[in-house]
A protein has these predicted regions:
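Intrinsically disordered, low-complexity regulatory regions in eukaryotic proteins
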Residues: 1-41, 50-186
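Short helix/turn-capping signatures at newly exposed starts of structured segments
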Residues: 45-47
């Protein structure tokens, strides 16, 4: 049986980031996840020496710029003794949809033109990282400004856009069907 661990995340943050509180991992709010049962069963003689604990995450409203954790502690077992040095776990939440993942750097190739203040037009090309926001949405940094530093929220908020991908291929061009895209400010 597992239960939430109220101290583990604070210990983790202090050990890994000390006074750099901007980098601290955040405790995922219980309103953002469901654990139907905090009990799991390991099969006797099974090939895999572990058991899975299903956790359902509701990602809507979570920021890809934050590190979210669910701290858990093993509190009881039926047949064995618990090792007090190995009875805690930090479950890291990784946002992912069909278009982007926090785990892997999902890149989009960008080509276009940019008009500078004096009217001069120049060509631009870059690979842009996409961040998952919801089932059908990703965030992309627009233009050539660099918001690669996740901690630079001012740049992220100023230069990012949200791309919403339609659920069905409703656009056709030259016999090929495409998902419609809606683009709006972040």
């Amino acid at each position: 049986t597992l239960e939430p661990d109220e101290e583990l995340l604070d210990e983790y943050n202090l050990l890994n980031y000390d006074l750099d509180t901007d980098k601290y991992a955040k405790r995922l709010s219980p309103s953002k996840y469901t654990i139907d049962s905090y009990s799991v069963t390991m099969r006797r003689g099974g090939e895999m020496p572990y058991a899975l604990l299903p956790i359902k995450i509701r990602p809507q409203g979570l920021s890809p710029d934050s590190l979210y954790m669910i701290p858990l502690k093993l509190t009881s077992v039926s047949a064995y003794e618990i090792n007090p040095k190995k009875n805690r776990v930090l479950y890291q939440v990784v946002l992912e949809n069909d278009y982007a993942s926090e785990k892997d750097n999902t890149l989009m190739s960008m080509r276009g033109t940019r008009q500078i203040g004096d009217g001069t037009v120049s060509k631009i090309a870059a690979n842009k990282r996409m961040y998952p926001l919801s089932k059908q949405e990703v965030r992309i940094n627009a233009g050539m400004e660099n918001s690669g530093n996740k901690a630079d929220l001012e740049l992220i908020n100023k230069y990012s856009i949200i791309v919403k991908i339609g659920e069905e291929r409703t656009l056709t061009y030259n016999g090929v069907s495409y998902y419609p895209l809606t683009v709006y400010p972040y």
